[in-house]
From Swiss-Prot:
Full protein name: 5'-nucleotidase SurE
Keywords in alphabetical order: Cytoplasm, Hydrolase, Metal-binding, Nucleotide-binding
Cofactor binding comment, as recorded: Binds 1 divalent metal cation per subunit.
Xref: HAMAP family: SurE (MF_00060)
EC number(s) given by UniProt: 3.1.3.5
Cofactor or coenzyme needed: a divalent metal cation
Annotated Gene3D superfamilies: Survival protein SurE-like phosphatase/nucleotidase
Function in brief: Nucleotidase that shows phosphatase activity on nucleoside 5'-monophosphates.
Gene: surE
One of the record's GO molecular function terms: metal ion binding
Length: 249
């Protein structure tokens, strides 16, 4: 098996090193990741300049682009052989609920949908790497198990791991996405030359975080697995929209 590993924290981030180490003796692993932190890049592609891959001393490939750029190139000729699976992470920080709309970690896994199989995105609920061994162990177990599972084509598994030692993890729960409250207003700043700017505020707290959601699972000490798909069609709105459209043109 050949696995393409990427992330949005950057090619030198501890999470991607831990993920590679966990999978290296299970599959033939290639790492293509951004040359800097690209958190919040979502599924953006770089279209205004050429992309220049550079192979680092450890064999990882650094790219001056987004997580989606990395996987796109990995699936389209940058690697000697196409991968069988895309695995993204391990992100330092949660990707829960609405986070998946902005997350470069999840976007890298979504780009892997073109392989037709299942991709996985892993996130640890901490900005610190102390419990990366827990997350890496769980990632290895899930990648191994997923290879024996027949899911619908183009499924992405979004995995969030509590910031706990392995012995304190209570198990795994299958969850739906919760929802966050609206984020605080951007923070206005003025530099020493008087030029105004803004910092985007941190994500809002869980607004829909009850039982069954990814928020609830991780807060109770469980690993959360949420199956995602690209199709965002709101089918329940079709009936009302059909009536609304009548006679417009």
């Amino acid at each position: 098996m050949r696995i393409l590993i990427s992330n949005d924290d950057g090619v030198t981030a501890p999470g991607i090193a831990a993920l590679h180490a966990a999978l290296a003796d299970y599959a033939e692993c290639a790492v293509i990741a951004p040359d800097q932190d690209k958190s919040g890049a979502s599924s953006s592609l770089t279209l205004d300049r050429p992309l220049h891959p550079q192979t680092l001393a450890n064999g990882f490939i650094s790219l001056n682009g987004t997580p989606t750029d990395c996987v796109h190139l990995g699936l389209n000729g940058l690697l000697p052989q196409a991968p069988d699976m895309v695995v993204s992470g391990i992100n330092l920080g949660a990707n829960l609920g609405d986070d998946v709309l902005y997350s470069g970690t999840v976007a890298a896994a979504l780009e892997g949908r073109f392989l037709g199989g299942t991709s996985l995105a892993f996130s640890l609920l901490s900005r610190q790497p102390d419990n990366l061994p827990t997350a890496a162990y769980i990632a290895r177990r899930l990648v191994e198990a997923q290879s024996r599972l027949a899911l619908p084509p183009r499924t992405v598994l979004n995995v969030n791991i509590p910031n706990l030692p392995l012995e304190h993890i209570r198990g795994i729960q299958l969850t739906r996405l919760g929802h966050r409250a609206r984020a605080a207003a951007p923070t206005k700043v003025v530099n020493p030359r008087g030029k105004e700017g803004y910092w985007i505020a941190v994500a809002g707290d869980a607004e829909d975080g009850g039982p069954g959601t990814d928020f609830h699972a991780v807060m109770q000490g469980y690993v959360s697995i949420t199956p995602l798909q690209l199709d965002r069609t709101f089918n329940d709105a079709f009936e009302q929209l059909d009536g609304w459209l009548e006679g417009l043109l």
